Structure formats: structure tokens, C-alpha cells
From Swiss-Prot:
Top-level taxonomy: Eukaryota, Metazoa, Ecdysozoa, Arthropoda, Hexapoda
Pfam families for this protein: Med20
Single GO biological process annotation from the record: regulation of transcription by RNA polymerase II
Family in the record: Belongs to the Mediator complex subunit 20 family.
InterPro entries listed in its UniProt record: Mediator_Med20
Gene (name only): MED20
Role played: Component of the Mediator complex, a coactivator involved in the regulated transcription of nearly all RNA polymerase II-dependent genes. Mediator functions as a bridge to convey information from gene-specific regulatory proteins to the basal RNA polymerase II transcription machinery. Mediator is recruited to promoters by direct interactions with regulatory proteins and serves as a scaffold for the assembly of a functional preinitiation complex with RNA polymerase II and the general transcription factors.
Species for this entry: Anopheles gambiae
Domain of life per record: Eukaryota
This protein's name: Mediator of RNA polymerase II transcription subunit 20
Keywords: Activator, Nucleus, Transcription, Transcription regulation
GO cellular component: mediator complex
Molecular function via GO: transcription coactivator activity
Subunit structure: Component of the Mediator complex.
Membrane-spanning intervals of the chain: none
């Protein structure tokens, strides 16, 4: 895999109309349909009787179907873990310690396109079957270090998303590296967990939206 950037797209029409608008733009570029994709997230909260509150986010990405991504949030730091599918079973077995917040299960799914070295995904974000927004994912496959290809990716994103895309690199990549505090994530080799972390960041923002603006519906 290469480097991936997520970009929320503002809604001026319904969700379906927005996706259709973006789909036409992507097809006009010459991108070729390449199946469907799905990224989902379910969140578990620890039993308050067992000590300080902790949260576990369990995510799946159709690009890595054999992997389960989990992120433990202690309140002061996040600890990522990548495992196989048995981890889902484990979470059901420790129900007394961690309880799923079913009403906040959230996912982004939609069509996947390929355009040369780029992969484009147009995602409709829903939480408990309620439409929350549109999230565009773009991957540039030949690149391994975000800082080396951001300018190219920015130009590509702005080419079909317009001025909604900032000239500045997304805040996720400007964070200090956990491996080398002297570097930012922009200078590290990109990993699948980086895509998951970006999705969790955006999913968290969507969850904070108690209701969609008037007139914005799927």
C-alpha cells in the first residue's frame, strides 16, 4: 500500500446527490470502477467498577480483510494493536469488562475507483443507519512517506474536490512521531494503522454531530 489521505466533503445537497456529484467528477477524470469498500468502527467502554475508564475502538478495513485493528484509549494516550479475526471473538467473551456502544457503531462505505497510481474511495458515513456525511479517501500507491508526496496528492485532491482541500498537510501527519519525537508522522513510513487512525479521527468528529443540518439527508 501507499500513502492515504482522508478528506471530508461538505454537504450542500443530500448525501446521495453529493456522492453522485463526486462520482461524475471521478469518472470524468478517467478513473475506473474497482469494486466496493467498507471501513467500520465499534467502540467498547470499560466497566467503571474495574478502575479508570478506558475505551477500545475496533475497526475493520476491507483493504485488509484478515486484520482487526484495535485502539485502546486510556484517556492520556492511544495504544494501537493489529490482530487477526479472532480478536472480534475475544471482545464478545470479555463483555462484563467491556460493553459495546451499539448505538455509536459507524461505517464508511461506497464505490472504489482506480486512476493510474491513485485509488479513490467515495464513502457514505452512517451511524446506526443514520447518514452523517461524505468522506473521500485517496491513496497514492507508489509513495511510502507522506511528506514526500503531499504536494502531488494535494494537487490531485484539489483537482476534483476544489478549494475544500487545504494547502496544508492534514493535522494527523504533523503530529510528533511516537518512535522518534524529533520527527513528525509526515516523515515516517506509512502503515495501514495510519489509515485506521485517520478514520477514527473523522468517525469521532461525526459522532459528535448530534444531528445533521436541516435539508441534509441521504
Amino acid at each position: 500500500m501507499g500513502v492515504t489521505v482522508l478528506q471530508p466533503y461538505p454537504l450542500e445537497k443530500s448525501g446521495a446527490q453529493t456522492i453522485d456529484f463526486l462520482l461524475k467528477r471521478v469518472v470524468a477524470l478517467g478513473a475506473v470502477p474497482a469494486g466496493q469498500f467498507l471501513v467500520d468502527c465499534e467502540t467498547y467502554s470499560s466497566n467503571p467498577q474495574l478502575g479508570p475508564p478506558k475505551t477500545v475502538h475496533i475497526l475493520h478495513n476491507s483493504e485488509q480483510p484478515a486484520s482487526v485493528f484495535s485502539i485502546l484509549d486510556t484517556g492520556t494516550k492511544q495504544i494501537p494493536l493489529v490482530t487477526d479475526g479472532l480478536f472480534d471473538l475475544l471482545m464478545t467473551r470479555i463483555a462484563p469488562a467491556y460493553t459495546s456502544k451499539k448505538q455509536t457503531k459507524i461505517e464508511s462505505k461506497g464505490q472504489r475507483f482506480e486512476f493510474g497510481d491513485f485509488v479513490i474511495k467515495l464513502g457514505s458515513v452512517t451511524m446506526s443507519q443514520n447518514f452523517k456525511g461524505v468522506l473521500v479517501e485517496v491513496e497514492y500507491r507508489p509513495c511510502l512517506v507522506p511528506g514526500s508526496c503531499w504536494e502531488l496528492m494535494r494537487e490531485f485532491l484539489q483537482g476534483f474536490l476544489g478549494s475544500n482541500v487545504s494547502n496544508s498537510m492534514p493535522a494527523y501527519f504533523t503530529q510528533r512521531s511516537s518512535i522518534n519525537p524529533n520527527h513528525s508522522k509526515a516523515n515516517e513510513i506509512y502503515q495501514p494503522i495510519d489509515t485506521i487512525n485517520q478514520y477514527l479521527e473523522h468517525f469521532t468528529n461525526y459522532r459528535k454531530q448530534t444531528m445533521a443540518p436541516v435539508g441534509v439527508r441521504p
